[in-house]
Amino acid sequence: MKLYLVRHGEAVSERINPERPLSPVGRKDVAKVAQFLKRAKLKVNEFYHSPLKRAQETAEIICNAIQPQGHLVSKDYLSPDDDIDKMISELSKRKEDLMIVSHLPFLLKLF
């Protein structure tokens, strides 16, 4: 199994929008990364993302570029300060490649 870790794109300020969706710059940056991954012929069928808007949008952009039929899955335990134990337990049972779109510091804990 290959595991791809992706931090969400730049989000708008909480002051501007409490849901913190991707900013226009964030959308553009993620689209560039998605096109790079497509040209690299990355094959991933499942994309886990946190329930937060910026991670969901990042996962959608990447999935649509590299695997339009891919499976997007929101996981409650991928938010910034969540413990990694549930993710580690799930990863230990997987055989298929997976992309996780989440946040710091959560992603740093997986290294």
Name the predicted role of every residue range.
Residues 1-2, 97:
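A general, composition-driven signal for non-globular sequence regions
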Residues 2-82, 107:
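Active-site-proximal alpha-helix that buttresses catalytic centers in soluble enzyme cores
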Residues 88-111:
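Active-site-adjacent alpha-helix immediately C-terminal to a catalytic or transition-state-stabilizing loop
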